[in-house]
């Protein structure tokens, strides 16, 4: 049985770690290299670095930050934000990223998923889906959660996997930043239709929420606020999950 992973998420804007509630009201949380090193030393399984300004403002992704992070941590990390071409992905992986995460660009050019997975393997190809509930289904949003794209999240997840996505990072926009817990139904529905690892994101406020997401079928639990605000340490988190019977490192 595969170990479940705990993944802190660093939202990076203009070279600093920030955390917003529902993609708004960003607060500065410091230098991404220092924050990444802290989580590595705490025992996180992986990291996700999302350049949340890149896609919206057409910025180049943060190559220098990626190079510096790769020098201080020895665990897998994923980089997303503003990856529009195969060349963008190549530069990030050469700079030290283990995986790249596509969101808006994959919706605009699904072929990019295939191109990256063929060159670097499915294990290096993550597709991030920002999903918002409408009745019994979920719609997909792009450009940092600002634009509805008129696609069903479950169908898009299946298509992304068929094109070569080796992992899906799924954020519930309804839950994001609320600290009320993951959208468990979204995780369960995705688990029924795709066979690649799922990273649950959006809404964690307690350790119980992390456990619920993993028990609902996610392979990894991503969180920001509870770790950035030092509500819980990584060792505390792992101890709680182990005691609950969740298979973690």
Swiss-Prot record:
InterPro entries: Aldolase_TIM, His_biosynth, HisF, IGPS_HisA/HisF, RibuloseP-bd_barrel. Its EC number is 4.3.2.10. The active site is at 11, 130. Keywords: Amino-acid biosynthesis, Cytoplasm, Histidine biosynthesis, Lyase. Disulfide bonds: none annotated. Gene3D superfamilies: Aldolase class I. SUPFAM superfamilies: Ribulose-phoshate binding barrel. Pathway: Amino-acid biosynthesis; L-histidine biosynthesis; L-histidine from 5-phospho-alpha-D-ribose 1-diphosphate: step 5/9. Belongs to the HisA/HisF family. IGPS catalyzes the conversion of PRFAR and glutamine to IGP, AICAR and glutamate. The HisF subunit catalyzes the cyclization activity that produces IGP and AICAR from PRFAR using the ammonia provided by the HisH subunit. This is Imidazole glycerol phosphate synthase subunit HisF. It comes from Exiguobacterium sibiricum (strain DSM 17290 / CCUG 55495 / CIP 109462 / JCM 13490 / 255-15). The gene is hisF.
């Amino acid at each position: 049985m595969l170990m479940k992973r705990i993944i802190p998420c660093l939202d990076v804007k203009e070279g600093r770690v920030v955390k917003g509630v529902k993609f708004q009201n960003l607060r500065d949380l410091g230098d991404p290299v220092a924050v990444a090193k802290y989580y590595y030393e705490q025992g996180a399984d992986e990291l996700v670095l999302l350049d949340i300004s890149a896609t919206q403002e057409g910025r180049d992704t943060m190559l220098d930050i990626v190079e510096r992070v790769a020098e201080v941590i020895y665990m897998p990390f994923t980089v997303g934000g503003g990856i529009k071409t195969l060349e963008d992905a190549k530069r990030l992986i050469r700079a030290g990223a283990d995986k790249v995460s596509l969101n808006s660009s994959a919706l605009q050019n699904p072929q990019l998923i295939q191109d990256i997975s063929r060159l670097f393997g499915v294990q290096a190809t993550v597709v991030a889906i920002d999903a918002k509930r409408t009745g019994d289904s979920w719609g997909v949003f792009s450009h940092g959660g600002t634009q509805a794209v008129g696609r069903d999240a479950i169908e898009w997840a299946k298509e992304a996997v068929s094109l070569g996505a080796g992992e899906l990072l799924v954020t519930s926009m309804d839950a994001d930043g609320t600290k009320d817990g993951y959208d468990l139904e979204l995780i369960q529905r995705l688990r029924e239709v795709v066979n690649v690892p799922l990273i649950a994101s959006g809404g964690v406020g307690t350790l119980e929420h992390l456990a619920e997401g993993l028990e609902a079928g996610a392979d990894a639990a991503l969180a920001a606020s509870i770790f950035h605000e030092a509500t819980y340490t990584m060792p505390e988190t792992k101890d709680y999950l182990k005691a609950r019977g969740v298979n973690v490192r």
